[in-house]
């Protein structure tokens, strides 16, 4: 029967397959070269995409090759043609703006070596619904150049998911804690919102949740700016609407010194800009197939992985969407028919059933990271809760009791019943008054910064969890590829024993070997990126620990100094009280 | 027989006062000077040595109790021990107490032999007793505060009562009570709560014009019986520092819950303070009631009280007592009326009529309002806010502790970064140290600030009781006045009636004489038969009327006389009662207004100033400890 099948095959089909093989090999060689390169080259590609005229000589060849690929895609599918042409049309006026600002930029660069950007985020609407709230981002440089951007709160989440999806192994803190949004954590919500609603508390301590959230958003943007890889991402540049070149030695300073609590109304132009950004973000999602807007906000630890990031479209269709092969491949080909597995559940989706391949963590370091992040998250939460409760008890309750006690002592000193001790009570009330004045708002701001630091660390741990979960999913995908490789190898083993019909069998063997080699190369590339992700994760943890140590250390030092000064003043108060008592006696 | 008993009691009191008067002058001054020298030399040494002496004397006391079997041995033991104790510890104040205690026994024997004394001697003894009591009151009024305070402080230093143990004792039939082991000088005795209650009620009747310190409220025995059960175990109560009741020697000898432990501790504290304040009251210490209460020979206090004729003869109500000498209650005092709650309305009506009484009641009303306001200020002001402050500090202590634990755990987990772990551990130590110092502060505030303030509130309540006593006496006086006036009005009415009756008799006699003249005129007109019959009828009517009037006059003459005699007797009695009550009221008002209340106000001012002094001291120590803690943290930081 095999001989009959071989006799039916026509030479023209063989020639076509050979041509297809050539195309695949060309694409594979280019991408294999990319996989060898570091992540900076990927950023360079995105950089060239953003700025066409700024291509350097070293990247010209890549640029040309990219254009060639794009041309081929445009020829095949009219959808892509429309998208790319619109993109180019949109960039033309930006190039004009670039020409205008280039002169200014060069002038500024001559004067200042390191540029310092101050970042400030203010609420642009009421905080009735946090998801629908609007925020105004102000970025200003020292030569009084300020840029104002309006963004919705959901846009921050969009940016978070885009960056997380594009840069595996990088931690981006979420915009704010998920507990506040879904109201799971009653303790935090009660303390945060109770403080605002309770009128008894003094205005210094009566900070608003808008202030906390603005600090968290500023911390997120600051983190992205400080990372040399993340800040060059096209999604981030679109989010910020930045047209100039970002200097490499850029430093971001968060302006959280004063906060009046007044909301800033959005102008009509900002609102229009916001709508345009929404449209643009939808297009970007459709291009990159990331589906960032579809991911629910509450699931911060679940990052969507797009298989198209790992595989070419053909391989993706062949592996995960067998039904769609009708368009590109001939079903009558006996080789392809034999290759398609009988049970389709294995490849139809990423959700695995009972037959899903099991994946176990081999690296002890990554397992340690899993343990570390869960413990650290819990510890930071505990610190946050206890410090909050400590503030409420010491700064609020004690002061309120002493305040009422002071009024009572004044009343007693004025009363005629206790005349001999009236002076003593009056001095005692004065002591309490001086206590309230001195210790009312002294260490409050400092403790508040500590709370925000703890909260930021909690959010970092959540982001780190998402990275680890991302890597787990990638491990599962590698298992799928391994299964595919095993099947291909078995197919080759079946074909190799037959040596009778040399021409037909050689042709089959070569096609099978080519396919096996292609899949094996992709597997190696993916596995290499998997190893790279592991290294990124470990580096990220080390960097976090260093940064955390520095920040906590500085914060604790300031707390220590303030506490010492506070105790000195406290002791001085009571020491001053005693001689007066002797004089009165 | 009752008169003889009163005379004997007066003789006893007189002898006791004489003995105490004799005992004090030759030794008191020298001993005070000696004690002052001891205190100047060293602060700690005088405190330690009396305790050791007490322990030794306790052993001697046990030996005495074991050896005592008959009265003869009881007589012989003091004579045998008097010599060596006198030689070894002549400088201590305890010896005059011992001597006075020993001297009482032969005097009692002497009083038993005095039953055969002559009546004249009895009367003279009674008079001397009265004069001596009044003299003592005058001397108390004359004393200055400067001389009073050192003596009080000296006594406080020399002899203080401690309640060593609180244990459960069963009295059969499934009932149980808490027994408090009291130590005073060299003797220990067990007393239950009802014994303290009985002592206080006796003192209120014996010294109605004196401010008796309060005792804690009564708790149900059933609750105690349920809560205090099981095997016995000792809970050593912690000491709360200086300037307060020292409970470091006290032990709760029972397995109790935390709340019950606090309750018993509170009771021990209040009862200890009660007894110590009684010791500082000179008027009370002149009598032997305190020493009798603390005498281990009197095992059962209730039996002692019932067997004692002095206590059993006291009237039940303090309003029927003689304020100067309650043991010498006269017949007049016994017959005084006791005002009820409705009599306050009468007081309001009476006060509107009389200006002098109105002024008096106004001044005392102002005083009462002042003390009520004072109590309110203490209770709702200082005490309330101190309690709230203590609670807030307690919560803060918990927060410090939790932060310390969290930082310590975090430092342990973050061992990779050595520098950060080290600093976190130092910071956790700082928070833990702050928690410990705050715990000490909370304990001190609770035991040495809040509870003394609570005692001050109760003392103010006792002061109001004194004012109420005076008020009831005033009501009593008003009742007597009212009844006296009503009796006098009745007497006047009777006299007026007598006068009216005499006038009527005169009129009747005149009319009778007139009728006689008419009778003479009738024979002149007897010419006709009609005139004769009409004149006869009229004469008969007059005769009948005259006879009726005469009979009525004879009947009324005897009754008014008897009534007037009775009324005069009652008026005389009421006049005597009025005189007595007015004198008593004057004395009571004078003593309360000029002696007791100023004394109390000085004491309360001293107490409040001491409380605030301790408060500032505790706060200062707390601040200093906190500063040292954070300085140490900074030192470690600089060293790292």
From Swiss-Prot, chain A:
Biological processes per GO annotation: protein retention in Golgi apparatus; regulation of TORC1 signaling; retrograde transport, endosome to Golgi
GO molecular function per UniProt: phosphatidylinositol binding; phosphatidylinositol-3-phosphate binding; phosphatidylserine binding
Cellular component GO terms held in the UniProt record: cytoplasm; cytosol; endosome; vacuolar membrane
Annotated disulfide bonds: none
Annotated region described as Disordered, given as residue ranges: 27-59
Miscellaneous comment text of the record: Present with 1270 molecules/cell in log phase SD medium.
PANTHER family: FI18122P1 (PTHR10555:SF170), SORTING NEXIN (PTHR10555)
Protein name in UniProt: Uncharacterized protein YKR078W
Species annotation: Saccharomyces cerevisiae (strain ATCC 204508 / S288c)
Curated annotation (Swiss-Prot), chain B:
Record function comment: Required for cytoplasm to vacuole transport (Cvt), pexophagy and mitophagy. Also involved in endoplasmic reticulum-specific autophagic process and is essential for the survival of cells subjected to severe ER stress. Functions in protein retrieval from the endocytic pathway. Required for proper sorting of the v-SNARE protein SNC1.
Molecular function via GO: phosphatidylinositol-3-phosphate binding
Notes on the domains: The PX domain binds phosphatidylinositol 3-phosphate which is necessary for peripheral membrane localization of ATG20 to the perivacuolar punctate structures.
Name this protein carries in UniProt: Autophagy-related protein 20
Encoding gene (name): ATG20
Residue ranges with Polar residues bias: 1-18, 126-153
GO biological process: autophagy of mitochondrion; cytoplasm to vacuole targeting by the Cvt pathway; early endosome to Golgi transport; intracellular protein transport; macroautophagy; reticulophagy; retrograde transport, endosome to Golgi
Binding site for a 1,2-diacyl-sn-glycero-3-phospho-(1D-myo-inositol-3-phosphate): 192, 194, 218, 267
Domain of life the protein comes from: Eukaryota
Subunit annotation: Forms a complex with SNX4 and ATG17.
Keyword Protein biosynthesis (UniProt): no
Organism of this sequence: Saccharomyces cerevisiae (strain ATCC 204508 / S288c) (Baker's yeast)
Coiled coil: 475-512, 562-593
Family indicated by similarity: Belongs to the sorting nexin family.
Single GO cellular component term: cytoplasmic side of endosome membrane
Compartments, record wording: Endosome membrane; Preautophagosomal structure membrane
Keyword annotations from UniProtKB, A to Z: Acetylation, Autophagy, Coiled coil, Endosome, Lipid-binding, Membrane, Phosphoprotein, Protein transport, Transport
Modification type Phosphoserine: residues: 361, 363
Chain residue ranges for the region called Disordered: 1-63, 126-156
Miscellaneous comment: Present with 358 molecules/cell in log phase SD medium.
Membrane topology, record value: Peripheral membrane protein
UniProt-listed SMART domains: PX
Alphabetized SUPFAM superfamilies for the sequence: PX domain
Any Pfam family matching the protein: PX
Modified residues (N-acetylserine): 2
Ranges of residues in domain PX: 140-301
Matching InterPro entries: AH/BAR_dom_sf, PX_dom, PX_dom_sf, PX_Snx41/Atg20, Sorting_Nexin_Autophagy
Stretches that traverse the bilayer: none
């Amino acid at each position: 029967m095999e001989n009959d099948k071989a006799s039916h095959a026509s030479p023209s089909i063989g020639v076509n397959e050979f041509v297809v093989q050539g195309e695949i090999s060309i694409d594979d060689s280019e991408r294999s070269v990319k996989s060898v390169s570091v992540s900076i080259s990927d950023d360079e590609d995105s950089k060239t995409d953003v700025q066409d005229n700024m291509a350097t000589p070293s990247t010209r060849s890549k640029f040309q090759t990219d254009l060639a690929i794009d041309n081929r895609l445009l020829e095949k599918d009219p959808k892509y043609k429309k998208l790319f042409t619109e993109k180019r049309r949109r960039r033309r006026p930006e190039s004009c703006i670039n020409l205008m600002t280039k002169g200014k930029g060069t002038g500024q660069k001559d004067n200042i070596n390191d540029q310092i950007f101050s970042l400030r985020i203010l609420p642009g609407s009421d905080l009735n619904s946090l998801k629908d709230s609007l925020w105004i981002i102000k970025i200003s440089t020292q030569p009084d150049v300020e840029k104002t951007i309006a963004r919705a709160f959901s846009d921050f989440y969009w940016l978070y998911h885009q960056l997380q999806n594009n840069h595996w192994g990088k931690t981006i803190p979420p915009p704010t804690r998920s507990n506040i949004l879904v109201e799971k954590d009653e303790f935090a919500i009660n303390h945060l919102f109770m403080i605002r609603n309770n009128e008894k508390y003094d205005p210094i301590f009566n900070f608003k949740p808008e202030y906390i959230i603005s600090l968290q958003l500023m911390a997120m943007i600051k983190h992205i700016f400080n990372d040399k890889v993340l800040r060059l991402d096209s999604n981030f540049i679109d989010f910020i609407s930045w047209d100039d070149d970002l200097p490499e030695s850029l430093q971001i300073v968060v302006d959280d010194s004063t906060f009046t609590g007044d909301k800033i109304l959005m102008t009509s132009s900002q609102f229009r800009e916001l709508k345009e950004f929404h449209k643009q973000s939808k297009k970007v999602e459709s291009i990159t197939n990331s589906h960032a807007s579809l991911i629910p906000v509450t699931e911060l630890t679940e990052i969507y992985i797009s298989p198209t990031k790992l595989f070419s479209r053909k391989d993706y269709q062949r592996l995960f969407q067998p039904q769609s092969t009708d368009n590109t491949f001939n079903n009558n080909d006996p080789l392809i028919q034999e290759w398609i597995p009988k049970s389709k559940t294995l490849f139809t989706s990423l959700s695995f059933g009972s037959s899903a391949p099991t994946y176990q963590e081999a690296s002890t370091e990554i397992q340690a990271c899993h343990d570390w992040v869960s413990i650290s998250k819990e510890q930071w939460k505990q610190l946050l809760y206890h410090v909050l409760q400590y503030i409420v008890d010491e700064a609020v309750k004690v002061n309120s009791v002493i305040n009422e006690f002071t009024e009572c002592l004044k009343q007693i000193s004025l009363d005629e019943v206790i005349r001999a001790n009236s002076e003593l009570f009056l001095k005692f009330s004065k002591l309490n008054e001086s206590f309230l004045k001195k210790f009312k708002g002294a260490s409050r701001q400092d403790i508040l910064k500590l709370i925000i630091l703890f909260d930021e660390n909690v959010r970092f741990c959540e982001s780190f969890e998402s990275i680890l979960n991302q890597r787990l999913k990638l491990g599962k995908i590698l298992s799928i590829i391994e299964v595919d490789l095993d099947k291909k190898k078995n197919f080759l083993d079946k074909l190799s024993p037959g040596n009778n019909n040399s021409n037909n069998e050689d042709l089959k063997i070569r096609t099978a070997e080519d396919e096996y080699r292609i899949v094996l190369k992709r597997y190696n590339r993916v596995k290499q990126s998997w190893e790279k992700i592991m290294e990124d994760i470990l580096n990220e943890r080390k960097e976090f620990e260093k940064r955390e140590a520095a920040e906590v250390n500085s914060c604790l030092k300031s707390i220590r100094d303030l506490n010492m000064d506070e105790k000195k003043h406290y002791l001085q108060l009571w020491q001053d009280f005693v001689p007066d008592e002797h004089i009165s006696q | 027989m009752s008169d003889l008993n009163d005379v004997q009691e007066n003789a006893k009191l007189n002898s006791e006062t004489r003995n105490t008067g004799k005992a004090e002058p030759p030794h008191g001054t020298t001993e005070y000077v000696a004690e002052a020298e001891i205190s100047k030399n060293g602060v700690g040494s005088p405190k330690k040595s009396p305790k050791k002496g007490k322990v030794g004397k306790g052993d001697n006391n046990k030996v005495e109790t074991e050896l005592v079997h008959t009265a003869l041995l009881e007589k012989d033991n003091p004579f045998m021990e008097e010599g060596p104790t006198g030689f070894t510890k002549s400088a201590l104040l305890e010896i005059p107490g011992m001597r006075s205690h020993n001297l009482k026994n032969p005097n009692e024997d002497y009083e038993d032999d005095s039953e055969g004394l002559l009546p004249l001697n009895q009367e003279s003894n009674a008079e001397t007793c009265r004069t001596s009591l009044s003299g003592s009151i005058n001397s108390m009024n004359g004393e200055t505060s400067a001389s009073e305070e050192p003596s009080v402080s000296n006594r406080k230093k020399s002899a203080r009562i401690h309640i060593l143990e609180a244990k459960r004792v069963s009295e059969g039939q499934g009932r149980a009570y808490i027994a408090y082991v009291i130590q005073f000088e060299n003797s220990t005795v067990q007393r239950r709560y009802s014994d303290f209650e009985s002592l206080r009620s006796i003192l209120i009747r014996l010294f109605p014009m004196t401010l008796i310190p309060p005792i804690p409220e009564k708790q149900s025995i059933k609750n105690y019986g349920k809560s205090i059960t099981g095997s016995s175990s000792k809970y050593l109560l912690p000491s709360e520092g200086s300037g307060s009741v020292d409970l470091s020697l006290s032990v709760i000898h029972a397995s109790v819950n935390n709340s019950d432990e606090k309750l018993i501790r509170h009771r021990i504290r209040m009862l200890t303070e009660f007894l110590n304040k009684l010791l500082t009251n000179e008027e009370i210490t002149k009598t032997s009631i305190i020493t009798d209460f603390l005498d281990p020979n009197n095992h059962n206090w209730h039996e002692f009280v019932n067997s004692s004729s002095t206590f059993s003869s006291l009237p039940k109500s303090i309003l029927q007592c003689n304020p100067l000498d309650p043991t010498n209650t006269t017949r007049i005092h016994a017959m005084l009326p006791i005002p009820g709650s409705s009599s306050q309305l009468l007081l309001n009506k009476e006060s509107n009529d009389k200006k002098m009484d109105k002024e008096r009641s106004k001044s005392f009303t102002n005083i009462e309002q002042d003390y009520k306001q004072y109590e309110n200020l203490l209770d709702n002001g200082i005490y309330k806010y101190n309690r709230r402050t203590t609670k807030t500090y307690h919560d803060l202590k918990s927060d410090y502790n939790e932060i310390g634990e969290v930082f310590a755990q975090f430092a342990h987990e973050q061992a990779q970064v050595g520098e950060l772990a080290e600093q976190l551990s130092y910071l956790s130590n700082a928070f833990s140290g702050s928690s410990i110092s705050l715990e000490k502060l909370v304990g001190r505030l609770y035991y040495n600030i809040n509870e003394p303030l609570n005692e001050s509130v109760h003392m103010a309540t006792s002061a109001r009781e004194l004012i109420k006593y005076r008020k009831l006496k005033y009501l009593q006086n008003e009742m007597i006045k009212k009844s006296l006036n009503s009796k006098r009005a009745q007497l006047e009415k009777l006299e007026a009636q007598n006068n009216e009756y005499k006038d009527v008799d005169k009129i009747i006699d005149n009319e009778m004489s007139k009728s006689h003249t008419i009778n003479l005129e009738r024979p002149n007109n007897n010419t006709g038969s009609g005139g004769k019959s009409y004149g006869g009828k009229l004469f008969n009517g007059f005769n009948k009327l005259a006879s009726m009037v005469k009979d009525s006059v004879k009947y009324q003459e005897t009754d008014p006389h008897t009534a007037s005699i009775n009324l005069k007797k009652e008026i005389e009695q009421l006049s005597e009662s009025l005189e007595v009550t007015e004198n008593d009221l004057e004395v009571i008002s004078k003593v309360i207004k000029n002696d007791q209340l100023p004394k109390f106000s000085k004491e309360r001012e001293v107490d409040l100033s001491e409380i605030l002094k301790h408060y500032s001291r505790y706060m200062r120590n707390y601040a200093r400890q906190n500063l040292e803690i954070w300085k140490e943290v900074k030192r470690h930081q600089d060293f790292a």
